[in-house]
Amino acid sequence: KDLLRRRDTMPDVTVKAIEDMEPIYGGLARRARAELGVSAWGMQVFTLPPEWDGYPNHNHSSDAFDPNQEEVYIPLSGTATLVADGSEFELRPGTMIRVGPDQLRQILPGPEGIRFVAIGGAPEAFTPGAWTELGADPPSPPAE
């Protein structure tokens, strides 16, 4: 009988196609966190073109625009190499890579490019950066 009970509220579920999410950096990234209403961690979707070398070598140390944040990269399609201190790690669908906040990292897309989800969070309570809100100006890429 309980299964047939009518629900008076909508489920707390958000569904959005990646292509319908607000683009930043000329479409290289999509504001997935804000579009889905996530409040517990940072999350963007990146689509990098083949063999592109413009993804910044960066970290999320205490003086970064997203400080003290470790990141997990989840490839959706394509391949890339994540470079950290001269070591190379393959990003491909079916793998996930975690990178600590102080670790410099750069992602170099393979011959077909790559689309991946980047999830970030810090040990303390998460506070979304103002730049991640819909319509906000993204930060300048870090200088190398």
Per-segment meaning from a language model:
Residues K1-P50, Y55, G129-E144:
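A short, N-terminal "cap"/entry segment at the start of jelly-roll beta-barrel domains
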Residues P56, L82-V83, V99, R105-P111:
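Short beta-strand His + acidic residue motifs that chelate non-heme Fe in jelly-roll/DSBH
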Residues G86-D102:
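Short acidic-glycine-tyrosine-enriched beta hairpin
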Residues G37, H58, D63-D66:
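Short loop/turn motifs at secondary-structure junctions and domain boundaries
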Residues L108-E144:
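Double-stranded beta-helix
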Residues V45-P49, A64-L82:
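Short, conserved beta-strand element in jelly-roll/cupin
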Residues V72, T79-T81, E88, L104, ...:
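Structural motif
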